[in-house]
Amino acid sequence: MDYKTPIRNDGEMVEQQILLSGNNSIKKNLAIYQRKILINQEITNESVTEAIYYLYTLMDLDREEGVEKNPKPIDILLNTPGGSVWDGLILVSLIEQMKDMGYTINTTAIGTAASMGFIIFITGSNRYSYRHAQFMLHDISTMMGGKVKDLEESMEDLRKCQKQVFDIIKKYTHVPDEKLKEWIDHKRDMFFYPDEAVELGIVDKVL
């Protein structure tokens, strides 16, 4: 459903079309007025689309105000068990692109940042954690069925996706290779808590 939402811009009220699915007024107000994007659900096509929509909306507003070259930081607040790797990587790509454009995209784990939520979290310019937050990594999983050739092709795609995830982890953290190898070899969920996450270069500061 479309809603026309007034947004304050240099003392004037302007009309901005905001697409809302259900009752998202809290998320909308956080995003538009406080530059805080809340992801408090699974990583799905819908939740990623919503986050991307708000990021583009903020970029549009910055251009209208003439501050796109020196924008205020944007905060992404995470409490998610993870979800779709493919959808999550789209958001990761946009965050990285915006950082290259000069944006500061901070991430804060307010609860759980697990699986794909973990990957989104570590791409932040500055990464913060609430004291009782938790982080979790595990191997990529999928539900597959069909002919042998189809399964082989799907597995190859999965391995490529897994490598992308590994490269992101190595780029943004100090998680040792042996821990990542343990993750794959033993199919273990790897849990981290704030203090350990700081040591591993996952978290910059515990709030």
Regions found by a protein language model. Name each.
Residues M1-L207:
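Terminal-region recognition feature
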